[in-house]
Amino acid sequence: MNKTILFLLLGVSLSAVAQTDALKAKISKSADKIEGQVIAWRRDFHEHPELGNNEVRTAGIVANYLKSLGLEVKTGVGKTGVVGILKGAKPGPVVALRADMDGLPVVERTPLAFASKVKSTFNGQSVGVMHACGHDSHTAMLMGVAQVLSSLKNELKGTVKFIFQPAEEGPPFGEEGGAELMIKEGVMENPHVDVAFGLHINSQTPVGTITYRPGGTMASVNDMRIIVKGRQAHGAYPWSSVDPVVVSAQIINALQTVVSRNLNVTEPNPAFTISEWTVYSDATNNLISHPNSPKIAPNDFNPNLR
């Protein structure tokens, strides 16, 4: 297990534990000891990914392991979320460590021995499921941190709340989920969280390197759908139709000018992107469809721009 990443995760609790060379050596030894287990967890989660609000298997493995460590465990938080509470032997702050658990509706095309072959349904369509964003690693890493900190319970000043979040990529369309629902259901209370930390792996960052910056580090994402209603006709008689596919194409092109011609780059955090993920129509190949639905994903660091 990469010690730099482990120390980052443990650092929030090292503020509550005497920061001595002996303690750091103990943590390093513990990290080495559980490296194989963390890798095994990660590969298992990678092979068995689950979509947002459906992380039943993953949540079960997490909850059972936290219970085996003697933690107070709450399940079903924000639908499939898991929360573990570790109370140190000494008084101190409440620190939350958070990892996400959900996979993505993506077909895995890798030669890995533990590649996902999972199929599921997403927004009414049959899809492959893959941990394409590293949440398998996040979950396994936080389980490892829970084990290390549990072994330091007698030296711990304060409480650590381990939050395993579902639906970080967003819940299915029309459903609640993710961090917002967990907060609504009280995940930051009982006990009240004084400070919370999370991280995200990044394949573009060299191994052993941690990157950070003031303010937002990763952009938010929004889910938007546009329904274009036309008039259906046979493809041989396009003049009898109002073709929503052609209209959708013009909308998609025009959306690019939202950023290039309407964004004030002198404002704070001007970074903003708009990506068109899918265009869906239910017509056969010889019909001009009636409804057509482009799916749009704006990304930003500034809610005012959104």
Predicted segments — roles?
Residues 50, 100-102, 167-169, 202, ...:
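Active-site beta-loop-alpha junctions enriched in small/polar residues
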Residues 19-22, 68, 246-306:
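Metal-dependent amide/peptide-bond hydrolase catalytic core
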Residues 119-130, 136-137, 148, 154-267, ...:
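Histidine/acidic-residue-rich, glycine-tolerant segments that coordinate divalent metal ions
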Residues 100-103, 110, 221, 276-280:
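Short glycine-enriched loops at secondary-structure junctions
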Residues 1-5:
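Positively charged n-region of N-terminal signal peptides that target proteins for export
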Residues 19-130, 140-144, 148-158:
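Acidic/His- and Gly-rich active-site-bordering loop/insert found
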Residues 6-15:
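Bacterial N-terminal signal peptides
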